[in-house]
Regions:
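Conserved acidic donor-binding segment of nucleotide-sugar-dependent glycosyltransferases
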Residues: 128-129, 133-140, 148-154
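Glycosyltransferase donor-sugar binding loop
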Residues: 18, 45-58, 74
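Nucleotide-activated donor-binding/catalytic signature segment of Leloir-type glycosyltransferases, i.e.
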Residues: 58-82
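A structural motif in glycosyltransferase catalytic domains
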Residues: 15, 30-34, 46, 107, ...
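Short acidic/histidine- and often glycine-rich active-site loop of Leloir-type glycosyltransferases
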Residues: 105-106, 119-129, 133-134
Length: 179
């Protein structure tokens, strides 16, 4: 991390999904949840950053049509990715199937909380309430509620960031910063 010069993103006040785009990542559920979130918080955006085939119809989501979705469907270099993570409110991993995730450890290396689904080892990595929030997979209403709760309670985000910094300081996990 010390050698990476973060690039400031062109967007602000956003929630971040990053990593390879594929059907087991549950991005469509996140887009649907963000449709609900943006009705309540129209100043918040979703950044989806990573390379892969978009496997669902983006046009069905209001966030795509209103500009609340920023899609960076390409390879991101280290500087850009670190900048995106550092400047996000928090990271979301809405996976419908996973064993573990380098995305979580990358977020933690930069002290960012994670909203993740209860699949694979994610609940073990993201201790609910301590480093982020765990929600059931494919549960749009609960995912939207978890996102809204963090947006509306920045002190929760700050407390989670402090927990992550204490338990996962930048020096401990330098080798796994980039997913």
């Amino acid at each position: 991390l010390q050698n990476i010069k973060p690039q400031k993103p062109d967007v602000s006040n956003y929630i971040l999904f990053f990593g390879g785009i594929s059907s087991h990542k549950g991005i469509e559920y996140l887009c649907e949840a963000m449709d609900k979130v943006c009705k309540k918080h129209p100043d918040v955006k979703l950044v989806v950053a990573g390379k892969g085939k978009i496997y669902f119809d983006l046009n069905q989501y209001a966030i795509y049509n209103t500009g609340h979705l920023v899609l960076l469907n390409r390879y991101l270099d280290d500087n850009e990715l670190v900048g995106l993570i550092r400047n996000s409110l928090f990271v979301v991993c809405p996976y419908i199937d996973a064993t573990q995730s380098g995305v979580v450890m990358s977020a933690f290396a930069l002290n960012k909380p994670v909203v993740a689904t209860k699949v694979g080892a994610l609940p073990t990595m993201v201790k609910n309430g301590q480093y982020g929030t765990i929600v059931p997979p494919k549960d749009v209403a609960t995912l939207a509620s978890a996102i809204n709760t963090l947006i509306e309670n920045p002190q929760k985000i700050e407390a989670m960031m402090a927990n992550i910094e204490h338990d996962y300081s930048e020096g401990k996990y330098l080798c796994i910063v980039i997913a």
